[in-house]
């Protein structure tokens, strides 16, 4: 049921693009010595809002075991049940099964300028590309209408479609990080922002983490406690040898100590989705949004690869009618799915990660 208007002719992404090498890019330029790398790492931490006090408290929690893979697991005495009727609103048949009143409430909110879209695009698609270090939002991932389209273009097309249906322009925000901000900004300039008529913002990250050496406790838990496929004898010996070497390295280097013996960018990590809403405050994007739309009340926040997410008037109206601060979208779980899911834990409705299951 998701619809969008994709740009055509000279407004769409060209079939081929010539890109000049980036002098500051990965692997470019002469090698740097350890002192220069340390200075660069310190500079990156300072520029991206590294909080040493929070980092220090996290290290203490990791060393004490308060934060660990094992402590994340629910107690074996926990009662875990499936959700019950009333825990979720079924939208699997599309917004048609929601009330007309919900649609009218949602349409009024959209035309009143009360909604903006925030697309989380700060990641480098490490799992998706196997560690290629790309900017996922800029990837021309699908051929639609005869041309390959990027995630950015598709999401802007959906906001454009909803806005044009109701005669308004919907503000759209893309969150970025130290990994993606420069590339995203340059790309949007090159494609003239896909001629998006509404307000368009980039929300650069203002929090960054410094990687730590893993603890032996967590390594052993991940390898010995969690289920995994057993390999043939020779492959299993090789895997066990590699893991034994990693445990020795963690002990010798210092468990939960800062990981700095690598390229500076490899020592940092984005802090995760939770921090993107506070980032809107820290980097001034929310202030700019409110100056543009003082009546703004609701944000639709979604991952850059959640292609079905768009401002649906009926779903928006259902959220507003509920009077709740947050409405989360969940999908039906299949047996082979990995990740989190919705369940009742000891009678309370919770989103539970698969790693936390007893």
Feature names for model-found ranges:
Residues 91-119, 133-358:
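Domain-scale recognition of functional cores that engage charged ligands
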Residues 121-127:
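Conserved phosphate/anionic-ligand binding catalytic regions in large, soluble enzymes, centered on
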Residues 1-100, 109:
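Low-complexity, highly charged intrinsically disordered N-terminal segments
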